[in-house]
Amino acid sequence: MSVSAFNRRWAAVILEALTRHGVQHICIAPGSRSTPLTLAAAENRAFIHHTHFDERGLGHLALGLAKASRQPVAVIVTSGTATANLYPALIEAGLTGEKLILLTADRPPELIDCGANQAIRQPGMFASHPAQTISLPRPSQDIPARWLVSTIDQALGALHAGGVHINCPFAEPLYGDMDETGVEWQQQLGNWWQSDKPWLRQALQLESEKQRDWFFWRQKRGVVVAGRMSAAEGKKVAEWAQTLGWPLIGDVLSQTGQPLPCADLWLGNGKAVSELAQAQIVVQLGSSLTGKRVLQWQATCEPDEYWLVDNLPGRLDPAQHCGRRLLSSVERWLELHPAEKRQPWATVIPQLAGQAWQAAVASNEPFGEAQLAQRIRRYLPEQGQLFVGNSLVVRLIDALAQLPAGYPVYSNRGASGIDGLIATAAGVQRASARPTLAIVGDLSALYDLNSLALLRQASAPLVLIVVNNNGGQIFSMLPTPQDERRQFYLMPQDVDFSHAAVMFGLAYHRPDDWPSLDEALAGAWRRAGATVIELAVNETDGAQTLQQLLAQVSRL
């Protein structure tokens, strides 16, 4: 019997089972122990293959693919720390709902805890972060093929959101020619090989029912809070709120068009907070709010009813409101809860939102990151999408910009880390094939510099704007100790990214005013492939501009 041949047949069943659950994209890192999985994936024509030498970046590439495709994405890595490098992407997927299937090759049990090379304790290593965990045995013909395929089906069929960790031990030899070993074992599955359905099918029914008293609450004074949702849902939410006559507080990831722009500015005004206190019901559609003032208001508001609608399970409400947690997609919830045409009840808030927007526009002439955030709408590619990094840049765009309704916006706002942002943006672009504008800070770019390699395969124009304010300037907005702030919080690196772009063969520009930025972007959207545009800005201007606008709007 050929061990290497049966390893591959075992892996082929696993990979074929994944295709029955909508897996098209598969991300593969180099490794020897993962050879059976890699070769099985390479031979399966149902897959679109993606490769990367860095497992941490590979995990985030898969995360971006899952975000834009809205399909489960598989990842193959070898044993040891290669597996551990998937942890950040898995954590993010668990918090934002993307389905990642991690196939981690492993040493067989007899090589664990005995000093064998590249052998760590992988079963259960991700603790509670995966939605499902499967620790497979070593491949054996004594285990029926139908057990293997039904084990995969059970886990994926029950997967509502988040990751699945499938640990796959393989014994050596891993290489060799294929022979007839395991053919009869595979044939136990009969016509399954010719079908496109799972071996084990199960229905996943998790959505909440229609709220029978909605007809009553829709006649009251309400507020709509829009968190993370799809572009199509964002447009529908904006129309729904307008019909109800309820003010809409739209997050940067809501894709609602933010009809009341600059919410994170005007929520610092006492008049707005007083008017919102008259609301009898707050309906929050989507989680993961960004703005600090939005979160502060959300934490202190006390309506008669607080409803939170999201298709992810769990509370998702750090303020622990008394109310209803409704498990549903936003689109389905809107279908079940139609709006009734009513006159707007809030009069102060629209005025404040308009004044806040005018204040932001009036401050947009100097060349800086706050001004870039306010102007961002004019730089979006037609029929494209926006990927927003974390830390200061996402807060500036959330507070100062007004994005088009229904324009796709992506970000990693689950755990809100600065790791893997370039890789995630690359995955979003690959899955959608749209022109993509991605914006990250300089520390985020340094953290994920390896992933510039992934941008070389962009299928449509991709522009990565690196806002270089020389460090983590978000900490200048926090009460960090003055004497220790620069060394221990801001950590300026005094770098530019020209050589990084050259190393990976990417086009590079470093504009120093708005006309030169306009010119660089116009050229980037006309050429195929990726372009890095570095904006070297004054270190403190972005944070100071935001603080000045907050103070100005609070006095209106």
From Swiss-Prot:
Catalyzes the thiamine diphosphate-dependent decarboxylation of 2-oxoglutarate and the subsequent addition of the resulting succinic semialdehyde-thiamine pyrophosphate anion to isochorismate to yield 2-succinyl-5-enolpyruvyl-6-hydroxy-3-cyclohexene-1-carboxylate (SEPHCHC). GO terms for molecular function: 2-succinyl-5-enolpyruvyl-6-hydroxy-3-cyclohexene-1-carboxylic-acid synthase activity; magnesium ion binding; manganese ion binding; thiamine pyrophosphate binding. It holds the Pfam family TPP_enzyme_C. It catalyses: isochorismate + 2-oxoglutarate + H(+) = 5-enolpyruvoyl-6-hydroxy-2-succinyl-cyclohex-3-ene-1-carboxylate + CO2. Its EC number is 2.2.1.9. Keywords: Magnesium, Manganese, Menaquinone biosynthesis, Metal-binding, Thiamine pyrophosphate, Transferase. The gene is menD. PANTHER family: 2-SUCCINYL-5-ENOLPYRUVYL-6-HYDROXY-3-CYCLOHEXENE-1-CARBOXYLATE SYNTHASE, PROTEIN PHYLLO, CHLOROPLASTIC. Homodimer. Disulfide bonds: none annotated. Its cofactor is Mg(2+); Mn(2+); thiamine diphosphate. One of its GO terms (biological process) is menaquinone biosynthetic process. It is an enzyme of class 2 (transferase). NCBIfam families: menD. Pathway: Quinol/quinone metabolism; 1,4-dihydroxy-2-naphthoate biosynthesis; 1,4-dihydroxy-2-naphthoate from chorismate: step 2/7; Quinol/quinone metabolism; menaquinone biosynthesis. Binds 1 thiamine pyrophosphate per subunit. Belongs to the TPP enzyme family. MenD subfamily. It comes from Klebsiella pneumoniae subsp. pneumoniae (strain ATCC 700721 / MGH 78578). This is 2-succinyl-5-enolpyruvyl-6-hydroxy-3-cyclohexene-1-carboxylate synthase.
